[in-house]
Amino acid sequence: MDTISDSAKKMGMLIDDLLSFSRMGRQAISLRQVDLGSLVHDVIRELEPDAAGRNIAWCISDLPAVGGDAAMLRMVLANLIANALKFTLPRPQARIEIGSLPGQASEAVVFVRDNGVGFDMTYADKLFDVFQRLHRAEEFEGTGIGLANVRRIIARHGGRTWAEGKPDLGAAIYVALPRALQGGEDEKT
């Protein structure tokens, strides 16, 4: 009975994630200036139960404001931070760094970096594809849709995504977003 219940929960998560992925391709974007630092702190508070009892060193730098849809960007940050928590689980001392790269006038480059299990850069281009997993499902839960959703949301904002990692040394996921609202629009589809 437990196996059936677990399978039903996993199927429910998969369906929810697929619906979210589909919505992110169609949903109107409500553009405004978004304070990423504030969003990060909100997301970390929401994920506190996942971090409870763990030894995690958080290193959060000042983050810029960008033009974007606050709800969608919250989903991006929630996915990236949840992944950092998940993939540092085997570490007795996890380190999660959230910051931005300097020097870009037209775009803000924000990253989430961890000292988790990492990945082989040979597969970096697959990381953002739907249903792509670089680790076995038995090791780390997930549906393989989260980073595909991140890429879709960032692309809809006129941005880009990429990743860096090394096996057993951690990973960094980068998102580049326009600093200003694009074209002064309030809604964008």
Model-assigned labels for residue ranges:
Residues 84-88:
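Short helix-loop "hinge" at the ATP-lid/N-box region of the Bergerat-fold HATPase_c
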Residues 93-105:
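Short beta-strand/loop element within the Bergerat-fold HATPase_c
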